[in-house]
């Protein structure tokens, strides 16, 4: 099977449609379909911050309904899940934009979306191992010694948030270790979560979160080709939201 794995979308629905078209997909019955039978996959965080979180998430619902969804949920997916289940959540760091979209829905449509999103999230795997273990899709990455282990808080934390140090940056974001530099595994790991200006290949990993919602690009990596395909963002560029590694 050949895959086109798409980075963090964050509500940038128009850019997603452009990228799918660039990759050769057509919308058939509202489902992205490739003439050569390729499959799309996602590193998560379809929602929050951008202009069209609900449209983007509803596309994931349709893919799931068709049995065609490969989607590693990210920290924003998890936060929205907890909020919609009634947990007390601070409406900041992006979720407030999705909540604002929800508030514009009719009561009936809002109730339906909440129910459908909870079902959507409950059905997801934390990360995906494909092509007989040669390909791993995990939102913020995964350390080699965690691959194939049973569910744990350590595994969940790493896949959702990355290799956090416990310290924070001045803007409140967590400080993370560059885990990919230490990775020596055989599986090719595709991840996102940390915005970089260009897809970043390190050892046998690639970060494809190229900060579309911050004015960068929406990026896909084709597997097994390891070819990068990107679409420029339609959003304003915010330079300080991108991580630059030494």
Q: Can you say where each PLM-predicted feature lies in the sequence?
A:
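Acidic, His/Gly-rich catalytic cores of divalent-metal-dependent hydrolytic chemistry
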Residues: 157-246
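N-terminal active-site segment of His-dependent metallophosphoesterases
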Residues: 1-57
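Beta-strand-turn-beta hairpins that frame and shape the catalytic cleft
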Residues: 1-4, 129-136
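Active-site environment of divalent metal-dependent phosphoester hydrolases
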Residues: 12-14, 48-51, 78-81, 144-145, ...
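Residue-level marker for buried hydrophobic side chains located in beta-strands
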Residues: 5, 40-42, 71-72, 136, ...
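Active-site neighborhood of divalent metal-dependent phosphoester bond hydrolases
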Residues: 34-37, 49-129, 133, 157-158, ...
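Divalent metal-coordination and catalytic microenvironments
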Residues: 8, 45, 60, 74-75, ...
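Divalent-metal (often Zn2+) His-rich catalytic cores of metallo-beta-lactamase-fold enzymes
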Residues: 135-155
């Amino acid at each position: 099977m050949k895959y086109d794995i798409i980075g963090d979308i964050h509500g940038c629905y128009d850019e997603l449609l452009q990228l799918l078209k660039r990759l050769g997909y057509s919308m058939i019955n509202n489902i992205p379909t490739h003439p050569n039978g390729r499959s799309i996959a996602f590193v998560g965080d379809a929602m929050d911050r951008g202009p069209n979180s609900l449209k983007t998430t509803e596309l994931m619902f349709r893919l799931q309904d068709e049995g065609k969804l490969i989607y590693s949920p990210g920290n924003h997916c998890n936060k929205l899940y907890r909020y919609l289940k009634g947990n007390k959540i601070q409406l900041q760091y992006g979720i407030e934009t999705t909540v604002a979209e929800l508030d514009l829905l009719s009561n009936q449509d809002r109730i339906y979306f909440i129910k459908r999103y909870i079902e959507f999230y409950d059905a997801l795997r934390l990360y995906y191992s494909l092509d007989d273990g040669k390909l791993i899709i995990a939102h913020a990455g995964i350390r080699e010694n965690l691959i194939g282990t049973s569910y744990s808080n350590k595994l969940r934390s790493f896949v959702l948030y990355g290799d956090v140090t416990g310290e924070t940056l001045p803007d409140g974001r967590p400080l993370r270790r560059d885990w990919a530099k230490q990775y020596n595994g055989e599986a090719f790991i595709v991840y996102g979560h940390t915005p970089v200006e260009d897809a970043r290949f390190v050892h046998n990993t690639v970060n494809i979160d190229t900060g579309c919602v911050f004015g960068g690009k929406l990026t896909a990596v084709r597997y097994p080709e390891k070819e990068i395909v990107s679409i420029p963002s339609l959003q304003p560029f915010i330079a300080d939201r991108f991580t630059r590694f030494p």
